[in-house]
Amino acid sequence: MQQQKIKRFLAHFVLDHVTIEYLKYGHQLTIEQLKLLIFILHFTENHKEDLSLNMIIFYKNYQKNQLLKSITHLYEFNWISKKRHPYDQRRLVITLTQNQCSKITQLIEELEHFLEVKSTLIKEINHSTLLSYYLKCHSQFRVIEQSCTSQHLTLKELYLLGLLIISDNKTTFKSIKVHALKGIIAMGPIIKTLQSKGYLIKSRSRDDERYIVLTLRKEKINVIQSEIEECYNKLEQGIQHV
């Protein structure tokens, strides 16, 4: 059962990071900006009144400075339009043109297709609520990240340790790099940190000295398994009601 939870944790971690990169480089968006766009689209479709910044803050609990930065970014990339309220020039009103509505809808459809392709290893996902599932998953990872584990391990460190666990506690640096989400996670610094924390041993292969072998310290294996299982349980609790 622990092995299954570790594999699920790794699959969710990968899904989160590749989606962040997809939005960042494919659409110049963060996850928070995506969530804001979805909210603006749904509000525009379901309400006749103008959408002000104060209404967004009320409904979505944004910090005003953070919201202004996101609104400015979305406006500059033509995701949204903005204007001054006709009866109060101090108030900023957010609107969407028909083309912008279509653009956001297309983004959502493309993202759902991307998630469907990238989530084949996650059997728990109901594909009718795929985007909602992912957004809950992303939010829950941020909660876990901020709360810190009892062993003070980061999610990236747990990801690498989890890869070693499912590789029978020992593998080469070359094999690990295959799963390193190239360009997203720099494995070298993480390995050095885990060495200094006493979780793994780095050595040369006896069969071929060109290869670097990474081995988990035996006394740390149960601790690592418990940490990852605890993180997965927290993740599961946060997304189970989607």
Name each model-derived stretch.
Residues 32, 85-108, 172, 205-228:
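Short, cationic-aromatic polyanion-contact patches
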Residues 12-18, 40, 74, 100, ...:
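Intrinsic low-complexity repeat tracts in disordered regions, enriched in small/polar residues
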Residues 35-38, 69-72, 135, 139, ...:
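Generic structural signal for well-ordered, non-membrane alpha-helices
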Residues 22, 35, 188-242:
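C-terminal regulatory/effector modules of DNA-binding transcriptional regulators
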Residues 50-82, 88-91, 170-211:
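Canonical helix-turn-helix DNA-binding module
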Residues 1-27, 78-79, 93-98, 102-148, ...:
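N-terminal leader segment of winged-helix/HTH proteins
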Residues 20-62, 145-183:
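N-terminal helix-turn-helix DNA-binding core of bacterial DNA-binding proteins
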Residues 61-64, 106-108, 118-122, 185-187, ...:
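Glycine-rich loops and low-complexity Gly/Arg-rich segments
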